[in-house]
Amino acid sequence: MSRQINAATPSSSRHHRLSLSRRRINFTTPSEAQPSSSSRSQTSSSSRSHRRQERRQEQRVSEENVQIIGNVNEPLTRSYHRQGVTYNVHGEVNISNADPLLSQEDDVILINSENVDRERFPDISSQQYQNNIASETAAQRALQRALDLEAQLMNEIAPRSPVYSPSYAPNSPNYVIPQSPDLFASPQSSEQQQQSEPEEDVEVSCNICFTTFKDTKNVNSSFVTTTHCNHAVCFKCYVKIIMANSVYKCFCSATSSNCRVYNKHGYVEFMPIDVTRNQDSIKQHWRELLENNTVNNQTTDLNYVEQLQKELAELRAKTCQVEHKMTMLNSDYIMLKHKHAVAELDLQKANYDLQESTKKSEELQSTVNNLQEQLNKQVVESQAKFLEFERNNSDLVSKLQTVMSRR
């Protein structure tokens, strides 16, 4: 087995860079790709075409980096393309699959006599068909690489729209047979990649104040870095450190006063010129913000609504308290009414009792008067009786004395 290797030229190195983005092409054919018996018996016309094929192969070898494996006079059975280098295998050559030059990521084309399109080429031999297919494939690859390189150079010189692509008329010598959309695809530019990538909102926290910010990935950032390191902090912490120390010192000991603010177009470098310590400036700044920058601020509206809700809750609580007080006053009023009714009943009873007592007193007084009259009568009668008794007693005593004296 002989190998013919040409040195890499600048064009081949460009082909090497461009070929890294190409996809793998697999044309599956039977594993045993052996030339038929008709290919061994070549006619004079096939010999001439064979010589023309050799000259074309020599021209291609001079134009691009091509390695020929096997006997160049044998028919082309396989073709490998890897990292800008084309490997053409002629004849029956046993190649190990573990060969690093021919890994699974190579572009592989297997050719044998069964691939001949007899409808398009009814009279062509398998050798001529193999030569035509190989030359056509190599030409298409070379032309496509040239077009990709031209488009890349034009984009570097004068950037065009992402949908730009050169077009040629069908009769133009630069016309390429259309392939599938993902075949020989050129690498996308950075603008195309940014447009194709979906925007993703990511929550990132500061390592100093642990405040969480929500930014769009690869679009904007709320963090800044110094010009000497890539450790990011939030803008509030950067300003706080600058106000305290007049210079920013990162935890990696990088010291700088300048900072960089990033977005999808690049970065802006800021340098603090003057540090003025005035506590009233932030108050004035916030007064201006609240007057001019809170018209369409959803957070302010939410805060206002929340404040109104708090006031409404307080008013509801006060209303509940007033209702409770009114309920208590109503209950007290009802109790007082009940007490008043009871007092009136007590007064009526007292009046009734007083009337009854007065009546009883009058009755007792009349009874006492009657008894007094009876007593007076009895006293008079008793006095009269006593006087009568005394008189009778005196008469009896006198009579007794008289009787006694007579004895």
UniProtKB/Swiss-Prot annotation:
Residue spans of biased composition, Low complexity class: 31-47, 186-196
Main location: host cell
Span of zinc fingers (RING-type): 206-254
Enzyme superclass (EC): transferase
Coiled-coil zones: 127-158, 336-393
GO BP terms in the entry: symbiont-mediated perturbation of host ubiquitin-like protein modification
Region (Disordered): 1-69, 179-200
Keywords (A to Z) from UniProt: Coiled coil, Early protein, Host nucleus, Host-virus interaction, Metal-binding, Modulation of host ubiquitin pathway by viral E3 ligase, Modulation of host ubiquitin pathway by virus, Transferase, Ubl conjugation, Ubl conjugation pathway, Zinc, Zinc-finger
EC number: 2.3.2.27
Biased composition (Basic residues): 13-25
Recorded catalytic activity of this chain's protein: S-ubiquitinyl-[E2 ubiquitin-conjugating enzyme]-L-cysteine + [acceptor protein]-L-lysine = [E2 ubiquitin-conjugating enzyme]-L-cysteine + N(6)-ubiquitinyl-[acceptor protein]-L-lysine
Localisation per UniProt entry: Host nucleus
InterPro entries given in the database record: Znf_C3HC4_RING-type, Znf_RING, Znf_RING/FYVE/PHD, Znf_RING_CS
Biased composition (Polar residues): 1-10
Post-translational modification: Auto-ubiquitinated.
PROSITE patterns referenced in this protein's UniProt entry, alphabetically: ZF_RING_1, ZF_RING_2
Record-level Gene Ontology MF annotations: transferase activity; zinc ion binding
Function: RING-finger E3 ubiquitin ligase that plays an important regulatory role during the initial stages of infection. Migrates to specific nuclear foci early in infection supposely to prepare the sites for viral replication by targeting and ubiquitinating host proteins.
Subunit structure: Homooligomer.
Record-stated family: Belongs to the alphabaculovirus IE2 protein family.
Protein name: E3 ubiquitin-protein ligase IE2
Species this protein is from: Rachiplusia ou multiple nucleopolyhedrovirus (strain R1)
